[in-house]
C-alpha cells in the first residue's frame, strides 16, 4: 500500500494580546519576526523541510488573509491553500474544514493531516521531525495522535496529558495510550506531574487521517461536522483563498478539538516530543527562550543598556536606553511603549482591555498597516489633516475609489506612479505631485520595477479608512 499523502495544516487564527504592543488584533504574534528573520508562521512552515508532505494548508481569519498570502508567497508556498474563517469557532471546526479540503484534494485515499499552531517555537527541529516520523505508523493505522511535550519544569500555564499503557506499534516507534487530559494545574500539582514522569504538556499538535478525524467528529459532535460540511459545500475560490459559506459556518458551535474529539475517542495516543517547545505565551517566556547577553539581557533594535540586568528591551523605530534597572520588559513601537516588571507581564492583557474600553485603536492596529498592494505608515495627524507614507509594490495598485469627506495630495518620493483621476491618466516621477479633489474617482498604480513610495496628505472633515467607495478592485474588495 502506497504511503498516504501528508497535508500540514497550520492554524493561524487568533489575535492574542499577551505580546502587546507588538501583537495587535490585525497583526498578531504569528505574523511577527520574534526570533530571526522569519515570522512565526514562516518558521512553522520551514520546520517541515525534510518531511515529505504536500503544500501546507493555512487556516486564518479573513481579516489576516493578505498577510498570510504575502508570507506564503515569500516562501514560494502560495498555492490556493488558505482557508478563510468568517469568524473564529475554535479548533474543532477549523480542523474539520481542513479535513474536508484534504479529502477533496486526495479522494483516492484518506490523507494524513499534521495539525500545527503557527505561533509555537521549537528549538530542536530535528527532534520535531523525528517525533513526526515516529507518529506516522500510528496515524496510518487509524490512531489519533497528539504530541506530548516532555516537561522540563512544573509549568502551570499549560494543560497536561497523562500517558497510559504503551501503544503497540512498529519497531523503534514509541507511543502511549492517552489516559487523561488535565486542565492547567496549580504549582504543587504540576510538580507532582513532572516528578511522576507520566505527564506531558499538551502541545496542541496532532497527526491523524482526515477521514478518521471526521468519523470521530461525527460520532461525538455531529452538529459541528454538519455545519462544516454545509460551509464547504458552497466554497467560493477567491485568488489564493478558499472562502466557505459564511452563514453555514457562523451557525457552527464553538469547540476545541480536545473537548470535541481527543478526550472522547478510544483511539487517542500520545507521542512524546522533547524538542525545546514553547508557545511564547508572554514577554517573560520570549525572554527565556532568546539569546542573552552576559548580563542576562535580550535586546532587539537600537538599544543601549547601562547597569541593566535580566531585561527584555525591544526598539522598533528609535533609540531605547536603560540605566540601573533589572527584570524589566521594555517594548517600543511607533505608537506605543510598554514598560513592565518581567514577573508581572501576565497582566499586559488587562492594559489591552483598558485601551479597548477607552475607545482607543492601539490594541487593534499598528501605525504601519499592510495591504495586498503594499503598506502605509500613518506619520502624523491633527485637526482635519492626516499624513501617510504609502508604499506600493511593483505591478500592484489600489482600488478605483472615491471619498465623500476628504481630498488628497500625493507627492512621489521614489519610483513611478500611474494616477487616474476621473478617467484622466498621468505618470508621476520622483518629486512630482498631484491633487485628488473630494469626490473624484481615482486610482493609484505602480507600473515600475521598484517599489513606489509617496507621501499622502489628507484634508477634510472625516479622515478614517471607512470613508471609501470602491468601484473596482483587483483583490476582490468591492
Swiss-Prot record:
Pathway: Nucleotide-sugar biosynthesis; GDP-alpha-D-mannose biosynthesis; GDP-alpha-D-mannose from alpha-D-mannose 1-phosphate (GTP route): step 1/1. InterPro entries: GMPP_N (IPR049577), Man1P_GuaTrfase/Man6P_Isoase (IPR006375), Man6P_isomerase-2_C (IPR001538), ManC/GMP-like_b-helix (IPR054566), Mannose-6P_isomerase_type2 (IPR051161), NTP_transferase_dom (IPR005835), Nucleotide-diphossugar_trans (IPR029044), RmlC-like_jellyroll (IPR014710). GO terms for biological process: GDP-mannose biosynthetic process; polysaccharide biosynthetic process. It catalyses: alpha-D-mannose 1-phosphate + GTP + H(+) = GDP-alpha-D-mannose + diphosphate. Optimum pH is 8.5. The keyword GTP-binding applies. Its EC number is 2.7.7.13. One of its GO terms (molecular function) is mannose-1-phosphate guanylyltransferase (GTP) activity. CDD domains: cupin_PMI_typeII_C, GDP-M1P_Guanylyltransferase. It comes from the Bacteria. Belongs to the mannose-6-phosphate isomerase type 2 family. Involved in GDP-mannose biosynthesis which serves as the activated sugar nucleotide precursor for mannose residues in cell surface polysaccharides. In vitro, shows very broad substrate specificities for four nucleotides and various hexose-1-phosphates, yielding ADP-mannose, CDP-mannose, UDP-mannose, GDP-mannose, GDP-glucose and GDP-2-deoxy-glucose. This is Mannose-1-phosphate guanylyltransferase 1. It comes from Escherichia coli O157:H7.
Amino acid at each position: 500500500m502506497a504511503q498516504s499523502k501528508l497535508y500540514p495544516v497550520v492554524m493561524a487564527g487568533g489575535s492574542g494580546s499577551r505580546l502587546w504592543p507588538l501583537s495587535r488584533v490585525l497583526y498578531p504574534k504569528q505574523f511577527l519576526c520574534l526570533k530571526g528573520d522569519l515570522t512565526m508562521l514562516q518558521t512553522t512552515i520551514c520546520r517541515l523541510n525534510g518531511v515529505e508532505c504536500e503544500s501546507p494548508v493555512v487556516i486564518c481569519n479573513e481579516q489576516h488573509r493578505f498577510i498570510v498570502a504575502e508570507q506564503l508567497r515569500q516562501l514560494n508556498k502560495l498555492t490556493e491553500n488558505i482557508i478563510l474563517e468568517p469568524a473564529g469557532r475554535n479548533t474543532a471546526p477549523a480542523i474539520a474544514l481542513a479535513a474536508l479540503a484534504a479529502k477533496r484534494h486526495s479522494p483516492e485515499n484518506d490523507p494524513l493531516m499534521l495539525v500545527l499552531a503557527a505561533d509555537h517555537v521549537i528549538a530542536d527541529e530535528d527532534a520535531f521531525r523525528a517525533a513526526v516520523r515516529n507518529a506516522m505508523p500510528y496515524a496510518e493505522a487509524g490512531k489519533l495522535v497528539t504530541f506530548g511535550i516532555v516537561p522540563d519544569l512544573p509549568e502551570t500555564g499549560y494543560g497536561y496529558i497523562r500517558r497510559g499503557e504503551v501503544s503497540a506499534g512498529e519497531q523503534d516507534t514509541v507511543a502511549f495510550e492517552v489516559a487523561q487530559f488535565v486542565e492547567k494545574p496549580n504549582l504543587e500539582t504540576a510538580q507532582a506531574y513532572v516528578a511522576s514522569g507520566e505527564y506531558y504538556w499538551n502541545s496542541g499538535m496532532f497527526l491523524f487521517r482526515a477521514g478518521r478525524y471526521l468519523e470521530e467528529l461525527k460520532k461525538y459532535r455531529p452538529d459541528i461536522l454538519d455545519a462544516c460540511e454545509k460551509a464547504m459545500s458552497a466554497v467560493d475560490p477567491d485568488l489564493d483563498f478558499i472562502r466557505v459559506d459564511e452563514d453555514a459556518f457562523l451557525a457552527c458551535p464553538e469547540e476545541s478539538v480536545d473537548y470535541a474529539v481527543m478526550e472522547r475517542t478510544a483511539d487517542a495516543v500520545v507521542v512524546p516530543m522533547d524538542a525545546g517547545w514553547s508557545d511564547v505565551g508572554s514577554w517573560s517566556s520570549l525572554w527565556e527562550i532568546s539569546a542573552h547577553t552576559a548580563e542576562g539581557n535580550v535586546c532587539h533594535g537600537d538599544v543601549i543598556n547601562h547597569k541593566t540586568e535580566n531585561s527584555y528591551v525591544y526598539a522598533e523605530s528609535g533609540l531605547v536606553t536603560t540605566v540601573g534597572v533589572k527584570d524589566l520588559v521594555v517594548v517600543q513601537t511607533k505608537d506605543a511603549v510598554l514598560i513592565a516588571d518581567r514577573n508581572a507581564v501576565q497582566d499586559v492583557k488587562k492594559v489591552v482591555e483598558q485601551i479597548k474600553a477607552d475607545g482607543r485603536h492601539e490594541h487593534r492596529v499598528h501605525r504601519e498597516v499592510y495591504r495586498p498592494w503594499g503598506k502605509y505608515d500613518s506619520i502624523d495627524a491633527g485637526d482635519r489633516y492626516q499624513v501617510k507614507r504609502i508604499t506600493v509594490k511593483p505591478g500592484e495598485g489600489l482600488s478605483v475609489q472615491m471619498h465623500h469627506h476628504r481630498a488628497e495630495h500625493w507627492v512621489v518620493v521614489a519610483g513611478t506612479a500611474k494616477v487616474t483621476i476621473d478617467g484622466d491618466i498621468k505618470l508621476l516621477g520622483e518629486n512630482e505631485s498631484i491633487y485628488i479633489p473630494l469626490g473624484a474617482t481615482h486610482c493609484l498604480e505602480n507600473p515600475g520595477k521598484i517599489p513606489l513610495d509617496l507621501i499622502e496628505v489628507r484634508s477634510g472633515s472625516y479622515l478614517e479608512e471607512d470613508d471609501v467607495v470602491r468601484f473596482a478592485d483587483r483583490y476582490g474588495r468591492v
